[in-house]
């Protein structure tokens, strides 16, 4: 089932039985229908947990993960102790951009998943842009 964002919000407000995880799944499915990564422009997928943030650059045509990075990486942990800050997310975005430029990936499609473009998700995108990636 494909729902528009407006329909999802109506469902969330009207139907209290719609669980938060189900709502996130519906939002994720609507985004995946619109965002596809190709060989020329792979998809940058972001996952946010309470403690850390993870990102992957994915080629959807071949179903391969090209590059992955997280705030658990040693180089980021040495600079910033916790992975739940925007500074750690920004550093991770810059590191991801460096790794992708080594593999000659300059243009990507940003997939924020079910999360709002705010806070740590925005910090990853800003760090990747500062590192040289084009969205």
Swiss-Prot record:
InterPro entries: Ribosomal_uL18_bac-type (IPR004389), Ribosomal_uL18_bac/euk (IPR005484). One of its GO terms (molecular function) is structural constituent of ribosome. Coiled coil: none annotated. GO terms for biological process: translation. GO terms for cellular component: chloroplast; ribonucleoprotein complex; ribosome. Transmembrane segments: none annotated. It is found in: Plastid, Chloroplast. It holds the Pfam family Ribosomal_L18p. The keyword Aminoacyl-tRNA synthetase does not apply. The keyword DNA damage does not apply. Keywords: Chloroplast, Plastid, Ribonucleoprotein, Ribosomal protein, RNA-binding, rRNA-binding. PANTHER family: 39S RIBOSOMAL PROTEIN L18, MITOCHONDRIAL, LARGE RIBOSOMAL SUBUNIT PROTEIN UL18M. Binds 5S rRNA, forms part of the central protuberance of the 50S subunit. Part of the 50S ribosomal subunit; contacts the 5S rRNA. Belongs to the universal ribosomal protein uL18 family. This is Large ribosomal subunit protein uL18c. It comes from Phaeodactylum tricornutum (strain CCAP 1055/1). The gene is rpl18.
């Amino acid at each position: 089932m494909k729902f528009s964002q407006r329909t999802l919000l109506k469902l969330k407000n009207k139907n209290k039985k719609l669980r938060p995880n189900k709502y996130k799944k519906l939002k994720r499915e609507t985004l995946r229908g619109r965002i596809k990564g190709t060989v020329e422009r792979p998809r940058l997928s972001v996952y946010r947990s309470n403690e850390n943030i993870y990102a992957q650059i994915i080629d959807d045509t071949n179903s391969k993960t090209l590059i992955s990075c997280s705030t658990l990486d040693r180089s980021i942990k040495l600079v910033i102790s916790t992975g739940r800050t925007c500074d750690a997310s920004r550093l991770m975005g810059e590191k991801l951009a460096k790794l992708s430029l080594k593999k000659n990936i300059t243009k990507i499609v940003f997939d924020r998943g079910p999360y709002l473009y705010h806070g740590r998700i925005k910090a990853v995108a800003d760090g990747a842009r500062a590192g040289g990636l084009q969205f």
